[in-house]
């Protein structure tokens, strides 16, 4: 066993500073043991102090907020070169030494934990006196509340107490006797303990290790050093739900006006319907087609004129303007033209019909230059007018008109037998016929009233009128 001496000693520093560190020969003056701040505000720490012998001293010093200083509550020692330190001797350690046998916490640098158990001994008489006083109080209460029947029970209690006084024991004294029977704990010497059993935890000086909670129950409120710089403490937003919804809805409605392509597509969709207005063009094509069909007939008629191709003689020149040779050609052409005009009356107006007539007449009489007869003279306007106004031609036309009218009247009589038109319908038909005659006075002589189509739907309309 070594001759080293070890004692537990509590170092303290008064309240005021933020950080206090203990250093000395035990850690080669490195400042590795900070003091703990208590609830009172002062700093304390209990640690084992080793002495090589009785004459040896324990030198130490305090580092308060980074400044090395000496405490006035401990002995001071001047070292060479004007350095001053605190120190402890064996006498100082023995005075503060606690009872042997106290348990230590090695993780806390050998700090004491609790006091040794109380040594067992004879029971004290103070417990008996207290029990007797309590019993007397109980008696007085029971006497006030009890009746005659309860007096017997009180007497029995008195008898029991007298017996307890004779024996000198109570229920509590029994527990004391059991404590007496327990063996005594063997006292232990602090000097016999191994010196290297206590561990000192290394501490980083850069860390602020002295921060402690002033409130025992918890950490308490946090006080921020710069509350003005934190946005959460200054900025407060009051948002109105209605205004926010209106603003968001307005932003969403902005893309709705950008529906330009949709409008253009509608225009393009409607554009194909424009050709419907060009229906008259189709009608003119049909008329042109009908005219083209007439040209072969006219060409077929021309050989009648060009059958004999003799040399030009004065007799032939005189025979050309005769109406007898031209009459059958004109009559056949006019009859065919009249029939085809009747088929196209429902489509073309009166003005168009007159124009088409003039064109067809010109085409018929412009065919004369095709004949390869040099000596023949072309017909003049006067001769053509005389041919048209000839009585033979007019008589034939009137006969044909009468025949056509008779056939149409027969057909109408047959249809009228099937359908009995009302007086209103007859009036309407007469009014329409008069309107047609007034609209086209030139064609009234050659054209006949249009034949009405009588279909199923037409019959229904007439019935509902």
Curated annotation (Swiss-Prot):
Compositional bias segments (type: Low complexity): 166-177
Modification after translation, per record: Cleaved in the vicinity of position 160 to give an X-DNA-binding N-terminal subpeptide and a non-DNA-binding C-terminal subpeptide.
Residues bearing the modification Phosphoserine: 153, 156, 271, 319, 343, 394, 440
Residues bearing the modification Phosphothreonine: 182, 295, 366
Segments of this protein annotated with the region Disordered: 107-227, 247-276, 298-465
Bias type Basic residues, positions: 127-151, 451-465
GO CC term (a single one): nucleotide-activated protein kinase complex
Keywords assigned: DNA-binding, Phosphoprotein
Keyword Phosphoprotein set for record: yes
The keyword Phosphoprotein appears for this protein: yes
Top-level taxon of the source organism: Eukaryota
GO biological process, one term: signal transduction
Any matching Pfam family: AMPK1_CBM
Compositional bias per record (Acidic residues), positions renumbered to this chain: 156-165
InterPro entries per the UniProt record, alphabetical: AMPK1_CBM, CRP1_MDG1_kinase, Ig-like_fold, Ig_E-set
Basic and acidic residues: bias regions: 337-363, 385-398, 404-428
Any coiled-coil regions, as ranges: none
Gene3D superfamilies: Immunoglobulins (2.60.40.10)
GO molecular function: DNA binding; protein kinase binding
Region annotation X-DNA-binding: where it falls in the sequence: 160-161
Functional description taken from the UniProt entry: Cruciform DNA-binding protein which exerts an enhancing effect on the cleavage of cruciform DNA (X-DNA) by endonuclease VII from bacteriophage T4.
Classification via PANTHER family: 5'-AMP-ACTIVATED PROTEIN KINASE , BETA SUBUNIT, CRUCIFORM DNA-RECOGNIZING PROTEIN 1-RELATED
Family listed: Belongs to the CRP1/MDG1 family.
Name of this protein: Cruciform DNA-recognizing protein 1
Record organism: Saccharomyces cerevisiae (strain RM11-1a) (Baker's yeast)
Gene: CRP1
């Amino acid at each position: 066993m070594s001759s080293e001496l070890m004692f537990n000693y509590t170092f303290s520093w008064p309240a005021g500073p933020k950080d206090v560190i203990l250093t000395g020969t035990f850690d080669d003056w490195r400042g590795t043991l900070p003091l703990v701040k208590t609830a009172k505000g002062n700093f304390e720490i209990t640690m084992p102090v080793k002495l090589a012998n009785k004459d040896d001293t324990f030198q130490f010093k305090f580092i308060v907020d980074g400044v090395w200083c000496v405490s006035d509550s401990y002995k001071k020692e001047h070292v060479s070169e004007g350095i001053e330190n605190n120190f402890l001797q064996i006498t100082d350690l023995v005075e503060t030494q606690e009872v042997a046998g106290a348990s230590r916490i090695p993780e806390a640098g050998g700090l004491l934990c609790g006091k040794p158990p109380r040594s067992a001994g004879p029971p004290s008489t103070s417990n008996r006196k207290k029990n007797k006083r309590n019993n007397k109080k109980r008696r007085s209460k029971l006497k006030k509340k009890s009746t005659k029947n309860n007096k017997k029970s009180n007497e029995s209690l008195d008898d029991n107490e007298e017996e307890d006084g004779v024996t000198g024991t109570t229920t509590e004294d029994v527990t004391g006797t059991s404590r007496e029977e327990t063996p005594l704990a063997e006292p232990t010497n602090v000097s016999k303990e191994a010196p290297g059993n206590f561990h000192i935890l290394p501490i980083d000086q850069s860390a602020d290790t002295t921060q402690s909670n002033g409130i025992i129950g918890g950490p308490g409120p946090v006080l921020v050093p710069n509350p003005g710089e934190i946005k959460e403490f200054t900025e407060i937003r009051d948002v109105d739900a209605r205004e926010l919804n209106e603003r968001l809805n307005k932003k969403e409605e902005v893309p709705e006006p950008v529906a330009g392509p949709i409008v253009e597509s509608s225009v393009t969709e409607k554009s194909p319907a424009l050709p419907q207005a060009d229906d008259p063009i189709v009608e003119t094509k049909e008329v042109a087609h009908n005219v083209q069909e007439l040209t072969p007939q006219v060409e077929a008629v021309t050989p009648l004129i060009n059958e004999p191709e003799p040399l030009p003689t004065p007799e032939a020149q005189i025979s050309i303007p005769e109406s007898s040779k031209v009459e059958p050609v004109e009559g056949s052409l006019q009859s065919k033209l009249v029939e085809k005009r009747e088929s196209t009356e429902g489509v073309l107006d009166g003005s168009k019909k007159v124009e088409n007539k003039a064109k067809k007449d010109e085409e018929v009489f412009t065919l004369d230059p095709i004949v390869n007869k040099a000596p023949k003279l072309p017909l003049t306007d006067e001769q053509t007018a005389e041919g048209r106004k000839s009585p033979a031609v007019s008589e034939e036309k009137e006969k044909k008109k009468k025949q056509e009218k008779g056939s149409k009247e027969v057909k109408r009589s047959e249809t009228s037998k099937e359908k009995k038109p009302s007086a209103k319908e007859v009036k309407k038909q007469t009014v329409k016929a008069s309107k047609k005659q007034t609209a086209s006075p030139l064609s009234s002589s050659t054209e006949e009233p249009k034949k009405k189509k009588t279909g199923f739907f037409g019959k229904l309309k007439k019935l509902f009128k």
